[in-house]
Amino acid sequence: MTWRSLLIQNGGKLSLQRRQLLIQQNGESHTVPLEDIAVIIIENRETLITAPLLSALAEHGATLLTCDEQFLPCGQWLPYAQYHRQLKILKLQLNISEPLKKQLWQHIVRQKILNQAFVADETGNDLAAKRLRTLASEVRSGDTGNREAQAAALYFQALFGEKFTRNDNNAVNAALNYTYAVLRAAVARTLTLYGWLPALGLFHRSELNPFNLADDFIEPLRPLADLTVIHLYEQGRLKAELTPGIKQHLIKTLHYQISIERQHFSTLAAIDKMVSSFQAGVTDKNAKQLKLPEILPLKEYQYE
């Protein structure tokens, strides 16, 4: 199981040496086994990356993110055709019926709202948590009652104040956007490893979005990012610009402990479990087979 996430903040060169990632910076060299790497985030725009390394990362199922001038992830390198039965999965994906898509989306939205309720409880917003659990129980197939949007409005105002909106240009939204981007990349990576096309979503269907399916499956994980950010916010650690230390902290969301069916996993492992169960559910045409993560109090998963 891959478990490392790397943030490259200084210029230098990344290359392949004896099946390991070689990092050369400021006259020093470090190596990391490729089989340990899940995600690499390249923040420094002067970093050089060799083609053999990119090929080796793809072969090992690792994903690489590049960042824009605001140091937010803007591009992603994904493994291609790593699943041994690619055509089988493509046929499955193209033939998912509309009723099954709606049932799967119902489960996703319900778990997202339940996770939001947990975050509300963790932050002392008991009344909001109670209302969120009620909204979760009201989610219907396809979320025809739009309970997701109602929950979001209630949830964010409970966490960050009545005047807060996700469109505001502030430190909280910058931190949320950064963490969502990291989680989205991890979900997209796992989907491609299982042979799914990230562009073909269940609910998200924008023709301009190459990651619609990843945006479907990130939903129950968003509250994990929210809980991470609100802890930093309450501690007064969020500034107008995200510092290197804060980014390192936000990337830890990939390694926090979360639960699926009362078993504890790292976020990365839980994503794998979720995508694997999605495949089983689609194969058997049974949305109830989809296993979704439950948020726990923030604690790093202890790898064996």
Swiss-Prot record:
Keywords: Antiviral defense, DNA-binding, Endonuclease, Hydrolase, Magnesium, Manganese, Metal-binding, Nuclease. CDD domains: Cas1_II. Pfam families: Cas_Cas1 (PF01867). Mn(2+) binds at residues 148, 204, 219. GO terms for molecular function: DNA binding; DNA endonuclease activity; metal ion binding. Its cofactor is Mg(2+); Mn(2+). It is an enzyme of class 3 (hydrolase). InterPro entries: Cas1, CRISPR-assoc_Cas1, CRISPR-assoc_Cas1_C, CRISPR-assoc_Cas1_NMENI. Disruption phenotype: No effect on CRISPR interference during plasmid transformation. Its EC number is 3.1.-.-. Transmembrane segments: none annotated. Signal peptide: none annotated. The keyword DNA damage does not apply. GO terms for biological process: defense response to virus; maintenance of CRISPR repeat elements. It comes from the Bacteria. Belongs to the CRISPR-associated endonuclease Cas1 family. CRISPR (clustered regularly interspaced short palindromic repeat), is an adaptive immune system that provides protection against mobile genetic elements (viruses, transposable elements and conjugative plasmids). CRISPR clusters contain spacers, sequences complementary to antecedent mobile elements, and target invading nucleic acids. CRISPR clusters are transcribed and processed into CRISPR RNA (crRNA). Acts as a dsDNA endonuclease. Involved in the integration of spacer DNA into the CRISPR cassette. Homodimer, forms a heterotetramer with a Cas2 homodimer. This is CRISPR-associated endonuclease Cas1. It comes from Neisseria meningitidis serogroup C (strain 8013). The gene is cas1.
